[in-house]
């Protein structure tokens, strides 16, 4: 069921974002008087189509992992004399550049719109209050203390942990990052400076703030079982809701330690407390439908006190402003991470492919529509930036060729473009295969 949910959420997200991107190209082409043959969502066999009064075929194709806009172009077909003025290649460099850049621009506009809707509706979140500081960490060296709330980072307001994570990630390598804090529920401000010159982190394994040693206030996990899955190893071993899992010394077993034992995939013994009595049980993990080891239990969570919770909700104009700011932060973060990948400061193992995106889509959709919309905004920004990358098969590569044409006064030769396209396609395919390989390693 979780696989189908993730797959369905992924298809919806990709279909919407590809439609937005391709509509940007389509809209700009129409504005420039270019004839559009086909607007397709997906590749492969056409499963639905409709032709409008301008002769454009709108189609939905079998493979929902992309899309395209096919325009009248003298480089690819014989153009009738009466239609030459409607061909893409007959337009000025400026007009063609506008058509190319309109796709990524549409993705950024979608992200702004999505965050505008999110902030209008209201997004529940947790205040950025620090629960603890890891000893000898960068945060500890900066004398940041527990039970303080992060107010700003280099002057930018921080109302939630997601914003903090993004801002800190963009500060990687900077020697002086100013953080403003205050003791929780106090008006006294404190200033601290982080030295991030030699700091790097793995975004697949931890958040930026946790890598710095900042542990957020979050719901407490109690080793009292709140759920036992039917026909699971836990139920077969006789575990029940309300059972307390203990260490050998009869103290509570931390949930993370319990998970580590499960992930080893071997039988292990636990002590269980029930109705004042203590006894031993043996659990034998099995693999679930996602290939991960599990025993079929969930712990109870102590609800986070209301004083630590808030809702990000604003008026119409302020929501728009926040949407623009958030999209800008995401764009800067994406560019920084791309830069770190190119310089080797971040491992290419952090690249994610469609499987990771599908899992993220399913998880966010499972939490709620607001979170799914936020996830789509994030992917839309990434899609916009990646398409502007100067690789010949991408929009950015087309813009490079058009820039060279504007400088030289004539188009780049078909032969050079063809060679560049082949190299670009090979590089893009290699990155896609590598990202897929990373996805499989994470399963």
Swiss-Prot record:
Its EC number is 3.4.24.-. The chain crosses the membrane at residues 98-118, 369-389, 423-443. It is found in: Cell inner membrane. It comes from the Bacteria. Keywords: Cell inner membrane, Cell membrane, Hydrolase, Membrane, Metal-binding, Metalloprotease, Protease, Repeat, Transmembrane, Transmembrane helix, Zinc. Its main location: membrane. Zn(2+) binds at residues 21, 25. Belongs to the peptidase M50B family. This is Regulator of sigma E protease. It comes from Haemophilus influenzae (strain ATCC 51907 / DSM 11121 / KW20 / Rd). The lineage of its organism: Bacteria, Pseudomonadati, Pseudomonadota, Gammaproteobacteria, Pasteurellales.
